[in-house]
């Protein structure tokens, strides 16, 4: 494992986003462009996250004497819903979720019930205690009829890749010199699921580097 030095030049938080600027010093034996590209690719494509992937939706007529729920899928169509069911499901899958590392082996669930005409957001989802929402008031769908009521059972799963990663943006500048080391200035943005420093340290581990914070 090779030694790499990292210095935090800037840290800031804006709304739901962490921002950091790092000065990274590493052995000149490493090809600078290959090193920087590998680091960027790992940050954007190999970070772990949590998303709602399994959605079970049910709908019933409120005017009937007995509520009989029928299962719906993403290709169902209802004029009482302003969005397509496909878009509704997609909005749920795009919700950013946070879980603690000590809960990593647990199952993650949520429920959403829609009984009245209104706009429903992710704040209307009832979550199990081991997961939290990152953003507030993220739109899901609008119900415009008193005739229908809907229920959704949501199961969240962990995954690795661009759909799951908390990393939102990665930029870098390579600084060449004639010394025995090279350096990269790394600009990084993540959502509140994971901080910039932790994400960068994890990427170094994949590259088989040991990071020393200066």
Swiss-Prot record:
This is DNA-directed RNA polymerase subunit alpha. The gene is rpoA. One of its GO terms (cellular component) is chloroplast. It comes from the Eukaryota. DNA-dependent RNA polymerase catalyzes the transcription of DNA into RNA using the four ribonucleoside triphosphates as substrates. The keyword Transcription applies. It comes from Euglena viridis (Cercaria viridis). It catalyses: RNA(n) + a ribonucleoside 5'-triphosphate = RNA(n+1) + diphosphate. Its main location: plastid. Its EC number is 2.7.7.6. GO terms for biological process: DNA-templated transcription. Keywords: Chloroplast, DNA-directed RNA polymerase, Nucleotidyltransferase, Plastid, Transcription, Transferase.
């Amino acid at each position: 494992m090779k030694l790499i030095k990292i210095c935090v030049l800037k840290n800031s938080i804006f709304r739901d986003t962490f921002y950091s600027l790092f000065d990274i010093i590493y052995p000149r034996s490493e090809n600078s462009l290959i090193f920087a590209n590998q680091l960027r690719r790992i940050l954007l494509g190999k970070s772990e996250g949590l998303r709602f992937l399994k959605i079970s939706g049910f709908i019933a007529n409120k005017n009937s004497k007995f509520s009989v729920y029928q299962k719906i899928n993403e290709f169902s169509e209802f004029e009482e819903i302003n969005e397509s069911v496909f878009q509704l499901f997609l909005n749920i899958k795009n919700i950013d979720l946070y879980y603690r590392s000590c809960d990593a082996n647990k199952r993650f669930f949520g429920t959403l019930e829609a009984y009245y005409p209104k706009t429903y957001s992710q704040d209307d989802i009832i979550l199990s205690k081991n997961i939290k929402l990152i953003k507030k008031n993220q739109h899901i769908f609008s119900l415009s009829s008193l005739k229908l009521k809907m229920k959704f059972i949501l199961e969240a799963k962990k995954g690795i890749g661009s759909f799951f990663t908390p990393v939102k943006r990665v930029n870098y500048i390579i600084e060449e010199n004639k010394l025995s080391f090279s350096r990269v200035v790394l600009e990084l943005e993540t959502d509140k699921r994971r901080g910039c420093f932790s994400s960068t340290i994890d990427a170094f581990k994949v590259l088989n580097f040991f990071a020393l914070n200066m």
